[in-house]
A protein has these predicted regions:
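Conserved Radical SAM active-site core
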Residues: 1-76, 80-86, 100-104, 263-309
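N-terminal [4Fe-4S]-dependent radical SAM core
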Residues: 1-4, 43, 204-247, 285-297
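Surface-exposed cleft-lining segments at the edges of enzyme active sites
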Residues: 82-90, 118-128, 162-172
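Conserved C-terminal portion of the radical SAM core fold
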Residues: 95-160, 180-194
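Flexible, acidic/Gly-rich N-terminal and inter-domain linker regions that tether
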Residues: 164-223, 275
Length: 309
């Protein structure tokens, strides 16, 4: 199985100790986001690869070597150009860029992916602003990654517009920026969650597929079992896996975030608990995780049971 850590919160930034403890212990419990009393039991020896996603890996660096030695790992690193009006708790961008380089050197250029995600437009954050920042940041990072993934902010959630009152849904801004990205050749640019909406018009922009069979096969020089469906939403080409983490627990406070309207759950955090946030209740029902296998049997890399003794 592929373990995604996580689409719902920032585990490397805030909950890395918990994940390290649980994987070494041999199992963890993941609540159903629609029913917290239903939990999946995820066992470490079933994990074939881990896909991390974070805005700040600095607190996680002490665990990177262990994870990278024992699992096939992909690291998505989100670095965007916004100030405190949009990302109030993600301020030290220069230090984060240096950490991106450190993480790349500790793993490999192939394993780390830069996410310039999401792109939003306001009177302040125009296409010209994004072009300037993309140019600066891509020149900084192109020696440490091959890929930049981007998307445009989703406005289907009403609180996003409420949090960013001057948000502009401007086709001209978007078109100008897409033309600029399409002209760049220092990185491979591809979208997230947009399918081939832009790649059909801009041939140098790749189809949405942040964690694909092609990526895993190229990075780890392996063959994957043929995958049928399992994509997370329309326009998503990611390989099916198990997503851990819980909503309303990320402390970055980003105004565009769909996963954290508040942070009250963070107070329930216990790094020694089998559940990221909260406690196991007497009436909880635990089911085995049924995520599909990804790698062909002879090519799987995973811990043996003896590693947990």
């Amino acid at each position: 199985m592929i373990l995604y850590a996580s689409f719902r919160t920032d585990i490397p930034a805030f909950y890395g100790e918990w994940l390290y403890n649980r994987i070494k212990e041999g199992w963890l419990l993941q609540p159903n986001p629609m029913n917290a009393n239903q939990l999946q039991k995820i066992e470490s020896f079933n994990i074939e690869a881990i896909v991390f996603c974070s805005k700040d890996y600095r607190p996680f660096m002490k665990y990177v070597k262990w994870f990278n030695d024992n699992y096939r790992c992909i690291f998505h690193y989100t670095i965007t150009p916004y100030d405190s009006d949009i990302e109030p708790n993600v301020l030290d961008k220069e230090s984060i860029i240096e950490n991106f380089k450190e993480l790349s050197n500790a793993t490999s250029k192939e394993q780390i992916i830069w996410r310039y995600d999401p792109i939003l437009f306001t009177n302040k954050y125009t296409s010209e602003y994004h072009k300037e920042k993309l140019s600066i940041m891509s020149n900084e990072l192109c020696d440490y990654t091959y890929t930049c993934i981007f998307s445009f902010v989703s406005t289907i959630y009403p609180w996003v517009k409420k949090n960013i009152p001057d948000l502009i849904d401007d086709y001209k801004n978007k078109e100008e920026l897409l033309e600029y990205i399409n002209s760049q050749n220092n990185l491979h640019y591809q979208t997230c969650g947009h399918g081939d909406e832009y790649s059909s018009l801009y041939p140098n922009i790749g189809i949405s597929s942040c964690t694909s069979v092609d990526l895993l096969e190229k990075v780890f020089n392996i063959k994957c079992i043929e995958q049928k469906g399992g994509y997370y939403r329309k326009g998503c080409g990611c390989i099916q896996g198990t997503n851990i983490g819980q909503y309303n627990s990320c402390l970055h406070g980003c105004k565009y975030c769909y996963a954290a309207r508040n942070t009250y759950k963070q107070t329930l955090y216990d790094p020694t608990s089998p559940i990221l946030l909260g406690e196991l209740k007497e009436d909880s029902k635990i089911y085995p995780c049924k995520a599909p296998k990804v790698f062909k049997k002879e090519e799987q890399k995973q811990l043996s049971l003896f590693d947990f003794i």
